[in-house]
Amino acid sequence: MLNETVLAPLHREIGGKMVDFGGWDMPLHYGSQVEEHQKVRTDAGMFDVSHMTVVDVTGAGAKTFLQYVLANDVAKLTKNGKALYSGMLNHEGGVVDDLIVYLMEWGYRVVVNCATREKDLAWMVEHAKGFEVALNERDDLAMIAVQGPAAREKTAQILPELLTMDLDIFQGADVAALGDVTFFVARTGYTGEDGYEIMLPTSDADAFWRALMAVGVAPCGLGARDTLRLEAGMNLYGHEMDDNTSPLVANMAWTIAWQPEERNFIGREAISAEKAAGVTHKLVGLVLQDRGVLRAEQVVTCEGVEGEGVITSGTFSPTLSKSVALARVPVAFSGECTVAVRNKQLKALVVKPSFVRLGKALV
């Protein structure tokens, strides 16, 4: 039996094509994945991301606990509502999950992936022992992401308090909604466009989704969410990183807070040793020069360079009208490479792992 978000009946009502996603019955699209993708790049689209796991972390030891279990340092968060992206590492330096943590007036709010929910919760509970901390999973909250160049303006038609806030990127705040209800609205996303991710009581989710539709925000499924994040060069857990992949080879080195040196976070010793020995692989972008489509697990080679790489995520880019991919390759890979696609050797260009941001092509 698949899990469902509170919005599942509404997705079916408006024609959502439902599929199994990490044990959740979620909309893949509502008719055209490409049209939904383009809507987010040019106007505004919305995604039901209520399958994500929200955990509130409270108690006198909340900060020191998160400084221990996260590779990034929550001490960087000094303003309520501010967000931080981090990996949560295991003792071998692999990535248990990637997540966002918000500083709240009462503690911290952590948002982790749905597919890793059980593993993440067990990991956090196990390592909370010895800390004065409480972990509270917020299954009473839904989450809706509104993304695109018109996302903020259209959301403010329903939540007018946003007009006076002018939230910075990676900043959230409680926003007055209907009656005495408040929604937590953060200027974050997973598409490479501006917009909001909104956490709200499950009881308000249906009405809020319909209100967004009424002001012209297009319902979008997980298919478009994946092509958008891939164009933006954003990692997907289980593809670009996992329990056996170091953040140093997953384009996540920037999320590691090495200072102060005395902060002993889980995985520090392992990735410090890896860094000292010299990282052997890197995450790159690939842009296909020939006809075809790049897909995960295809093998990548580069003339004159020993070893081979592998595509971690690949797709046809609706924005660029060509196939793009993220790939883990030996550090010496650069310039032109070759990808094995259906017994053919196709040419691809190695680029930085980001293809489109704010509607503009970067390659």
Swiss-Prot record:
Gene Ontology MF terms in the entry: aminomethyltransferase activity; transaminase activity
Any coiled-coil regions, as ranges: none
Catalysis: reaction(s): N(6)-[(R)-S(8)-aminomethyldihydrolipoyl]-L-lysyl-[protein] + (6S)-5,6,7,8-tetrahydrofolate = N(6)-[(R)-dihydrolipoyl]-L-lysyl-[protein] + (6R)-5,10-methylene-5,6,7,8-tetrahydrofolate + NH4(+)
Cross-referenced Gene3D superfamilies: Aminomethyltransferase beta-barrel domains, Aminomethyltransferase fragment, Probable tRNA modification gtpase trme, domain 1
The enzyme's E.C. designation: 2.1.2.10
InterPro entries: GCS_T, GCS_T_bac, GCST_C, GCV_T_N, GcvT/YgfZ/DmdA, GcvT/YgfZ_C, TrmE/GcvT_dom1
UniProt key word Endoplasmic reticulum: no
Keywords: Aminotransferase, Transferase
GO biological process: glycine decarboxylation via glycine cleavage system
GO cellular component, one term: glycine cleavage complex
Similarity field: Belongs to the GcvT family.
Subunit composition and interactions: The glycine cleavage system is composed of four proteins: P, T, L and H.
Stated name of the protein: Aminomethyltransferase
Gene: gcvT
